[in-house]
């Protein structure tokens, strides 16, 4: 793992709102969850080529909102992985979807798995609570 300077976490909003410290940083992630869910609902009602690539993207957007919200509840190096993991889970299928639409449908489909696979690496190095 690449070490992160602990000063990185001092940007977090320090105000309390609705009983939550870092309130605006936490609550500002709700739109990601909403947009991701809306995308999944939209996909369910439309015939979209490579729909599963775009479904993976929208799941990643939901995970971005949840992971970033979790990180901002208590900003620390130990929770930062959840903030970044959601984003990379959205980026990989997004790029695979662009490749599928602009280069080759089969190439985009084949690339989703290998592009998502590196996301599993940080999970093996998460710090254990004692």
Regions found by a protein language model. Name each.
Residues 1-112, 124:
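Early transmembrane hairpin module of multi-pass membrane proteins
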